C-alpha cells in the first residue's frame, strides 16, 4: 500500500480538499485522511473494495488518541477499480461534506472540533495524481 503525506498545508472552515487519482486494477482499499497526525484524524474517508469482510463499502470515521471511534458506513459506492476518481472534502467547521464521484454528498461531524488542520495523508491502492486545498466552490457554512 502506498502512503503519501502532506504537512503544513492549512485546511480551515470554508476550504475544500480535492483529490484526483486512479485506483489500482485490483484494489483492496484507499483512504483520504485529514487531521493533526496519524493518531489524531478528524475525517477518515475509507473506500473499501474488498477489505476484511467489507465489500464495496464507504467507511467514514475519526481517530482520537490513536483509537478509532464509531464508524459511519455508507451504502453508496460510486468507485470503480482501475478507473480515475475525484473526491472533494469540504470543511464546514462543525462538519465535513464529502463529495463523491457521482455528485452525492456524505456528511460527517468534526468530532475533534479544531478550527484548522495541517496534516493530510493518503493510504492504499491508488495513485494520487493531484491534490488542492482552496476556498470551497461548493456551499459551505463559512
UniProtKB/Swiss-Prot annotation:
Pfam families: Gal-bind_lectin. This is Galactose-binding lectin l-1. The gene is l-1. It comes from Anguilla japonica (Japanese eel). Residues 3-134 form the Galectin domain. The lineage of its organism: Eukaryota, Metazoa, Chordata, Craniata, Vertebrata. Glycans are attached at residue 130. Its main location: secreted. GO terms for molecular function: carbohydrate binding; laminin binding. It is found in: Secreted. The keyword Glycoprotein applies. Keywords: Glycoprotein, Hemagglutinin, Lectin, Secreted. Signal peptide: none annotated.
Amino acid at each position: 500500500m502506498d502512503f503519501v503525506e502532506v504537512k503544513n498545508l492549512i485546511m480551515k472552515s470554508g476550504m475544500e480538499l480535492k483529490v484526483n487519482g486512479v485506483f489500482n486494477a485490483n484494489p483492496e482499499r484507499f483512504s483520504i485522511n485529514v487531521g493533526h497526525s496519524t493518531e489524531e484524524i478528524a475525517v477518515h474517508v475509507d473506500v473499501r473494495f474488498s477489505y476484511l469482510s467489507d465489500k464495496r463499502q464507504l467507511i467514514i470515521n475519526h481517530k482520537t488518541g490513536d483509537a478509532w471511534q464509531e464508524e459511519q458506513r455508507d451504502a453508496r459506492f460510486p468507485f470503480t477499480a482501475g478507473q480515475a476518481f475525484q473526491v472533494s472534502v469540504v470543511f464546514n467547521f462543525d462538519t465535513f461534506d464529502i463529495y463523491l464521484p457521482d455528485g452525492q454528498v456524505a456528511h460527517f461531524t468534526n468530532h475533534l472540533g479544531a478550527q484548522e488542520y495541517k496534516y493530510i495523508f493518503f493510504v492504499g491502492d491508488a495513485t494520487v495524481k493531484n491534490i488542492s486545498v482552496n476556498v470551497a466552490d461548493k456551499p459551505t457554512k463559512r
